[in-house]
Amino acid sequence: MIGHLRGIIVEKQPPYLLLEVAGVGYEITAPLSTFYHLPEPQKEILLYTHLIVREDAHTLYGFHNDHERRLFRALIKVNGVGPKLALAILSGIGPDEFVHCVLNQNIDQLVRIPGVGRKTAERLVIETKDGLSRWHTNDTPSPEGLRSSNTQPTQDAISALMALGYKPQEAKRAIDAIQKPDLSAETLIRLALKQMVLGT
């Protein structure tokens, strides 16, 4: 098992990034809660990782800290929740907000996440509540996000939302509703998700 990787960010386009470690490029899938903390390309970063091996693919998931990774591991143990949905949860509302929803049994907010129906939301609460009762990260991502090196942050943001399970029309409508110029892709995604999932 690969526990963590320290290397240079070559490319980043949510939910994927390319990390070069000792001359080897690792393609890593990460939640948006991790992307909010990533530096610019060509900068060094340490990512905690989780490797999932299947017959058709070996997929490496990366996380800003061990708290995120532990929550991801708890999520994929829930019946009906796979890695893709676990990433959508971490991307949609973030670790702390998810824990708050679980501990307060806020089913209505959980079902706003793409792919999470009422039954899945109820299972998330039932199967993770005990383990999350002492959860604290004390790690709030920057509300401004990080500047994307890509010259098309709007399109990158729409693509990232689609990768999370939103329909193209929903993704475009959410991004278009943000009337703020010169924002990075990460910030656009964060604001769009805040509106769609949290309703604020």
UniProtKB/Swiss-Prot annotation:
Transmembrane segments: none annotated. One of its GO terms (biological process) is DNA recombination. Residues 149-200 are annotated as: Domain III. GO terms for molecular function: ATP binding; four-way junction DNA binding; four-way junction helicase activity. Pfam families: HHH_5, RuvA_C, RuvA_N. Residues 144-148 are annotated as: Flexible linker. One of its GO terms (cellular component) is cytoplasm. CDD domains: UBA_RuvA_C (cd14332). Residues 1-64 are annotated as: Domain I. Residues 133-152 are annotated as: Disordered. Keywords: Cytoplasm, DNA damage, DNA recombination, DNA repair, DNA-binding. InterPro entries: DNA_helicase_Holl-junc_RuvA_I, Hlx-hairpin-Hlx_DNA-bd_motif, NA-bd_OB-fold, RuvA, RuvA_2-like, RuvA_C, RuvA_C_sf. It is found in: Cytoplasm. The RuvA-RuvB-RuvC complex processes Holliday junction (HJ) DNA during genetic recombination and DNA repair, while the RuvA-RuvB complex plays an important role in the rescue of blocked DNA replication forks via replication fork reversal (RFR). RuvA specifically binds to HJ cruciform DNA, conferring on it an open structure. The RuvB hexamer acts as an ATP-dependent pump, pulling dsDNA into and through the RuvAB complex. HJ branch migration allows RuvC to scan DNA until it finds its consensus sequence, where it cleaves and resolves the cruciform DNA. Homotetramer. Forms an RuvA(8)-RuvB(12)-Holliday junction (HJ) complex. HJ DNA is sandwiched between 2 RuvA tetramers; dsDNA enters through RuvA and exits via RuvB. An RuvB hexamer assembles on each DNA strand where it exits the tetramer. Each RuvB hexamer is contacted by two RuvA subunits (via domain III) on 2 adjacent RuvB subunits; this complex drives branch migration. In the full resolvosome a probable DNA-RuvA(4)-RuvB(12)-RuvC(2) complex forms which resolves the HJ. Has three domains with a flexible linker between the domains II and III and assumes an 'L' shape. Domain III is highly mobile and contacts RuvB. Belongs to the RuvA family. This is Holliday junction branch migration complex subunit RuvA.
